[in-house]
Amino acid sequence: MYIGVISMRYAKALLAYADEKGTEDTVYEEAGILADSFSRIPELRQALDNPVLPAETKLKLICEAAGGGKVSEELKRFVELVLEERREKFLQFMIMSYICLLYTSDAADDL
């Protein structure tokens, strides 16, 4: 599968889940912080790509990068799913896809 296909599928699932819980704006803010962390801290991506690092450690790193350790339950559960499915190497692309999806859906709502 292509990175874009996988990322978009997960991003749509996160958007639907956050929308169902009414937390899409909170998750959007956390996603923005996480996307910025990926850009500023290349070691974050390297850590996620490390197969020796346990999933629990990766979860803590991601939560710290997304909001100082305090993130919404929705984002945390999403990241747990990504780690469980061993798709963490696509997480940066999933987050960017989520931001784009929410941004374009908000823009469409304004029309």
Name what the model sees in each region.
Residues 1-105:
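Elongated, mostly alpha-helical coiled-coil "stalk/stator" tethers of large membrane protein machines
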Residues 106-111:
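A short, hydrophobic C-terminal helix/tail in secreted or cell-surface proteins
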